[in-house]
Amino acid sequence: MIAIIDYDAGNLKSVEKALVSLGEEVLVSRDSSEILQADKVILPGVGSFGEAMNNLDKFGLVDTIKKVTGNGTPFLGICLGLQLLFKESDETPGAEGLDILPGKILKIPAKDGFKIPHMGWNSLDIKPEARLFKGLETNPYVYFVHSYYLKAADEGIVAATTEYTTHIHASVESGNVFACQFHPEKSSDVGLKILKNFASL
């Protein structure tokens, strides 16, 4: 059973639909006991850092997520769900994130010829040992929609990178905690393979 955390985040239904298409058993919930009993947990997200943290707090999910990530349950953050795993974001100065992984979320720098938000397909440079990308070609294309990006404090957790006006840490893996800045649920067959790899952990 894979639990998708429901905290009024935008891309929840598309993540659920992608997993169901893979034959996975999925539960959408904001109930802590249900989430803690799941075999795997996904934190989706589209929206602002500060508002998302307020919602997680309001629904009593901050401690739940910290318990899940601390007890060895495979956990996947998607898009804003990646950003929330870190302590702070340029998007909402003063708001405190989950602070589960080391790093910060920065605004994508402006550059002539590049639109922000970054919306579209980019290729990834993936580490060969990255478990989420097992069985994929070296530079798969995935779909991004974001104005802020991760700069991880520990290069050792970076599983994939991309370039868009700057060097972007596009995916991280640390023990049982995985996260993607891009949207696997919108990334065609490559994205489904990534979700299948997570479901198979």
Q: What annotation goes with each model-predicted range?
A:
Residues 2-24, 182-186:
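N-terminal beta1-alpha1 ligand-phosphate binding loop
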Residues 38:
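An anion/phosphate-binding loop that grips the pyrophosphate of nucleotide cofactors and donors
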Residues 47-118:
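Cysteine-nucleophile active-site neighborhood
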Residues 88-164:
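Pocket-forming structural segment of enzyme catalytic cores
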Residues 139, 173-177:
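Beta-strand-turn-beta hairpins that frame and shape the catalytic cleft
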Residues 167-173:
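Short, surface-exposed beta-strand/loop micro-motifs that present aromatic residues
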Residues 180-201:
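Acyltransferase
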